[in-house]
Amino acid sequence: LQPTSATQPAYGSEEYIAAARELIEKCKKAGLQVALCDDVDSDERHPSGRAGGLFVAEYPQYRAKRLSMIEYICTTGEHVERPIRKTGMLMSVCAYEVDTGETLDLREFVVGDTIVWDVPAGNWNVLQFICEDDDESDCADYLSYDASLAFLTYTYKRLLGEGDPDAVAMTVSLGIAYQTSNRRQWSPDFNRVFKKEFGFDPEPLYPALFFDVGPNTTRYTALLINCRAKMLTEGFFRALNDFTRARGIISTASLAEPKTTAAPWLFGDGMAHHK
């Protein structure tokens, strides 16, 4: 079952749920197997991977998060007093020298909710990196195990109610990825997971996601994105595995295309998933 925006009754409506339940039951009686497909498409043709927006409307705490950068352009000798953005969690605060790529960790200059810093000579910018809700996305936070499990439980129960789980033989997940603005999906837990995985603090590395910070730029970005790929694996895909195994259902999924290890034209995260 792979509903689209053209499906009638409209996906997520009570009429759709009733029709889907009836279809599943008839397939079971006929000896046919049913696969539920959660698909996400950027042009909203496939609403099931987002539960049609119904899930995050009911559970806003599980909405996808994005990484936002707030940049303040400084002048040499300026006494900076800039408020910390309060719309999300502060992940990193740094200074970036535009001409040389040098970065400075400014955490010691955060006083309360304000960055207080005297700008040295050079062409410096102050950068805040904030993990905040992506109000433009109605996807679940796929980097979170709890959010992913809640999403799967929500969509499954809406279709089957308290019915026999044997009615469904397989779930298929397509397009589950970084469904936020410019694919900047992030997690408030990122720094903690990174430090546990690699043994050091990632906060000074954040500017490398947006700028050239010198010869280590590629290494830093690889470490950061590898951690995000791990969180996706330990988030949605582990939740999917646990959810379906507990119900005796087969789960399957696919990366954007199966040859990502041979021709990674799209994203390096695919190689981590294959690993």
Sequence positions of predicted segments:
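Carboxylate/His-rich catalytic cores and anion/metal-binding grooves
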Residues: 168-202, 240, 245-275
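N-terminal-proximal low-complexity accessory segments that begin disordered
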Residues: 1-9, 15
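Mature extracytoplasmic enzyme cores
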Residues: 12-222, 227-234
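Surface-exposed amphipathic alpha-helices with a cationic face
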Residues: 24, 28, 238-245
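Conserved beta-strand edge residues that scaffold enzyme active sites
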Residues: 5-6, 41, 258-259
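Short hydrophobic alpha-helical runs that function as membrane-insertion/retention elements
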Residues: 1-2, 34-36, 253
